Amino acid sequence: MDSIKNIAIIAHVDHGKTTLVDKILHHCNLFRSNESTGDLILDNNDLERERGITILSKNVAVEYKGIKINIIDTPGHADFGGEVERVLNMADGVLLLVDAFEGPMPQTRFVLKKALDLKLKPIVVVNKVDKENCTPEEVHEAVFDLMFDLEAEEWQLDFPTVYGSAKNNWMSKDWKTQTESIEPLLDMVLEHVPSPEIKEGNTQMLITSLDFSSFTGRIAIGRLQRGHLDTAMKVNLIKRDGTRVPSKIKELHLFDGLGRKKVDHVEAGDLCAIIGLDGFEIGDTIADFEAPEALPSISIDEPTMSMLFTINDSPFFGKEGKFVTSRHIRERLERELEKNLAMRLETTDSADKFIVYGRGVLHLSVLIETMRREGYELQIGQPQVIIKEIDGKKMEPIEELTIDLPEDVSGRAIEMVTQRKGEMLSMNPKGSRMVCEFKIPSRGIIGLRNQLLTATAGEAIMNHRFLEYSLYRGEIAGRINGSLISMEKGSAIPYSLDKLQERGKFFVAPNEEIYTGQVIGENSRQDDLVVNVTKTKKLSNVRAAGSDDKVKLAPPIKFSLEEALEYIQKDEYVEVTPSSLRLRKVFLDENERKRKKA
C-alpha cells in the first residue's frame, strides 16, 4: 500500500490553501493544455468563491511519481468545526499552510489541535514569501511554539518545512532561493507522510462525508480502514446506536483528479465513494456481512448559537421567492441536517417557526444565503447564544478573540471589547499595527465587527474561536440607537427622506417600496420613532416657485446578511428573499407593539 498517501490541508482563511491545490493539480497535469479552468478550482460553490472561504471539505486525487496522493481540503473556520473533525479522520498527515507575514492565526489553531490529537504528521508550508516585510524564519519559530503549546509529541515537533509562493508557482527548502516548480513540496509529502496503516481483519469503513446526486441518491464517502470492498458485495451498516442494517453495494468509485472513476474493487487505505446504501448517517460504519465490527463514531462540537427561522409573513411575501411555505422551509432544513453535522433543528409549538442551532453567525448565515439563492423566502430572528446550566450555575460560551489593527486606534477598540465584558490577554506590536488578544463572551462578539470597522476606518482584522463554557458575565449593552419605523405602505419619497435626515440614518433608497412596520433607518436617539416617508410635497399655489431647495440625500446604509443579523434587536426580524434583505419589527402594527410592551 505504499502507492497511496492521504493528506489534509490546514490553513487560515486567505493564506492560499485553495491556490496551492490549484497549482498541485496543474503540476500533475490534470488539465489538458486546451482546457480553461477558473482559478480556485476547489471552492466550487459561488458563496465560497465570493467570501474566499472553504465551507465544505472536498477531495482531490493526483498522481505524482507513480504514487497516488489523496488531498483533502478542510474548512479553516471554527464555525465549521463539524466538517473539520470528520475530514481529518481520512488523512495520515497534514499540510499546515501559514502566511509568511501573518504567521499562524487563531483559526489555524483550532484545526491543528484536532489534527495533532489524531496523531497526524505535520508538514509546514510557509507561503507568500514574496510579500514585502515578511519574516519566514520568525513564522517558522511561531509555528513551533504553537505546536508546543498544543502539546504536540516529539515526533510531531520534528516537522519538515518548505517555503515558497503558491501564486508564483514555486516551493523550496530555503526561502532565499527561488525554484522553478512546486516539486520540493510534493517530494516532501512522499518522503514524510506515512502510507496508510493496514490492519488485518474484516471490512471496516467509517462514513465521514456524504454527497448527493439526483439520479443515484445519497453517496457515502470515507476511508476503508481494513479489508476490501467489491461491487455487488453484501455488507452490514452499523448505526451509531449499534443497530445493524444489511445492505448491498451497487457501485464503487475512487477519487481521480477532480472527479471520480468507477471501479470494481477497493483495497484498504484508499478513500472511496459508495452508491447503493440506504438510510446511512455520517458516523456509521460499513462492516463485514458475516462478522460486523463497528468503528468508534465521530464526536462533533456542540452548537453555541441558535436562530429562529420563520415563514415570511410581511406584506411583500411571495413576490420575489419561489419557496415560501413552512413545508418548503422545513423540508429544506431537514435536507441540510443530513450533511451539516454541527447543525440541530428544533420545532416549536407553531408550525411556521423553527429553531436552528449552529456554531456561530457565519455557520448559519452561510445556510441562509444558500437557501436565499435557491429561491427561498424566510425571516430570521435575532441570534441567541446558548446558555447552559452546569452544576446549578449559569454558564455561557466564551471565545478567544484576536484583533489586528493600526496602533493609533487600538485604545478605542480595547475600550469597545471591555464594554462587552471582554478581558485582555496580551498586546503585541507588529510594525505599525497592534495584535491584541482577549477572552470575550460569544454574546459580546455579535455586532462587534461592525463597530470595530467603523471605529478603525475599516482597518481592523478580527478573528475568534470557541474556547470554553464559563460563568455568565452579566448583561451586555446592545445597540444604543433606536430604529426608524415606517408608518405607511408605499414608496419612499426623496422629499420626505430629506426632511427627516436629521432624525437618523436611512437604510432605504429613494423610491424603494416599503411597508408599515418596516425598519427603514437608525434613529439618532435611543428610542424607536415612527416616521412617514411616503408623503409628497403639496403642490398648492401658496408657495413661491423660486424658493425650492434642492434635495441632498446621504446614500442609504446597505447591510450584508451577517451585518443585518448582528444589527437587529430582540423585537425585530431580518426578512430574506432572493433579491432583497429588509429589517422589520416582529409586530408591524404600532398599537400592537405598545400593547406587547405594556
Range-by-range predicted roles:
Residues M1-V98, E102-P104, E138, A142, ...:
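P-loop NTPase switch module centered on the Walker A-proximal segment
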Residues D14, L20, G52, I71-D73, ...:
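Residue-level signature of catalytic and energy-coupling elements of molecular machines
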Residues S314-L337, K550, A554:
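A short, contiguous, amphipathic alpha-helix enriched in charged residues
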Residues K121, K131-H192:
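Canonical P-loop GTPase G-domain recognition
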Residues K23-I24, A61, E83-R86, M90, ...:
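Alpha-helical scaffold elements adjacent to nucleotide-binding pockets in ATP/GTP-utilizing enzyme cores
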